[in-house]
């Protein structure tokens, strides 16, 4: 299976098509991940210059687990750390789940920082009705021994952004990020790109008529982050329900994954069975919507989704709690603080996901040098 690999390159620009953001080019030659590894990583041609430094801020969570699997198997990404926040599950349980996934991938080199336990103002309501009591579909994998990083995620992110420019893939409520940027708004200048799985434009909500769970769980945090990005003249790439609802892992796709890679396929089967039952009972869907991996795929390849720029605010109270109010008609005449993604190709996404994740390897290829 082939895919187009996006990467930062020192080769002649004339050989590549520009994707639309500085320094990133899309090769006109199809590469598999194996080809990319053989031709670049083994020969030492890819170092930190080629890889994009990222933080994954998440609340694992079934679909968060799948997103981590995709990110950890993508050679373009230098995962500096995973930070957890209370959302689908409490932040400490999310850290334990992230560790279980990293062990499965052979990526125990990635540090985990535990973040905020409760939303800024609202009572914390988890999503274990959707993700199971353990957050991984009641698979109840054994706990992975070891200590987490002692520093709180908010302090870690603050200190990291004071030192260097990074990108953030936010897959959960924005509580950690709201605390970081409220404390030091100037640090937004060191966020090269922010991709957030959350919100909705025209699609209905998944925990209220109008709201997606991540923003509904801590609406004040989402509102703060969108407001601060507007004041900083920056944009959040919003991977909302308009596109993620297209990404349905069906029983047929799951069976195909198990045939391609029995070990990894069975791991995915164990964590998604509960999720599939929930989607059938609640929405009549045969399969399950896996939101978060699309955010990772889009971060790697901008052509995975399409949309438009807009000024967006997040409602914080009443029946509209957590709703993303997108000024698509420019009534407010304000500079965009978001890119709203509205179109995606599910078949292309699943080809991308399976080509990267379903390979038998111990993950050591993508480990950072000791």
What are these regions (language model features)?
Residues 38-50:
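Short, Lys/Arg-enriched N-terminal segments with co-localized hydrophobic residues
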Residues 52-58, 62-100, 140-244:
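Active-site histidine-anchored catalytic micro-motif
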Residues 112, 225, 296:
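A residue-level signal for conserved active-site and pocket-lining positions in enzyme catalytic cores
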